[in-house]
Amino acid sequence: MSQEIAVVGSPEFTTGFRLAGVRKFENIPDDEKDERLDDAVERTLDDEGTGIIVMHTDDLDHLSRGTREAVEGSIEPVLVTLGGSGAGSGGLRDQIKRAIGIDLMEEDD
């Protein structure tokens, strides 16, 4: 079964992905994230047709502890965060390591 990319976030964040052909998205206006973001992320996690969830790094702060732990620990679908500059923006290397369990860029001494 083929899986798709899903984007969760503000309309401004999801628009570029939609224009690029991403069909699965959850638009949550900034002023409603505290109330609605958990439900949107949980729906996306439960969707068997989704293989990758894309979110803005800053949006993780709006998630409840349980939802945040679920999405960060999920292997399928895997979470990819973009943007932001906080401590939680560990980069693509850490996201790949978390998703597959090994560090592909580890250097041998």
UniProtKB/Swiss-Prot annotation:
It is found in: Cell membrane. Gene3D superfamilies: ATPase, V1 complex, subunit F. InterPro entries: ATPase_V1-cplx_f_g_su (IPR008218), ATPase_V1-cplx_fsu_bac/arc (IPR022944), ATPase_V1_fsu_sf (IPR036906). One of its GO terms (cellular component) is plasma membrane. The keyword Lipid metabolism does not apply. One of its GO terms (molecular function) is proton-transporting ATPase activity, rotational mechanism. Keywords: ATP synthesis, Cell membrane, Hydrogen ion transport, Ion transport, Membrane, Transport. GO terms for biological process: proton motive force-driven plasma membrane ATP synthesis. Pfam families: ATP-synt_F (PF01990). It is a peripheral membrane protein. Belongs to the V-ATPase F subunit family. NCBIfam families: PRK02228.1. Component of the A-type ATP synthase that produces ATP from ADP in the presence of a proton gradient across the membrane. This is A-type ATP synthase subunit F. It comes from Halorubrum lacusprofundi (strain ATCC 49239 / DSM 5036 / JCM 8891 / ACAM 34). The lineage of its organism: Archaea, Methanobacteriati, Methanobacteriota, Stenosarchaea group, Halobacteria.
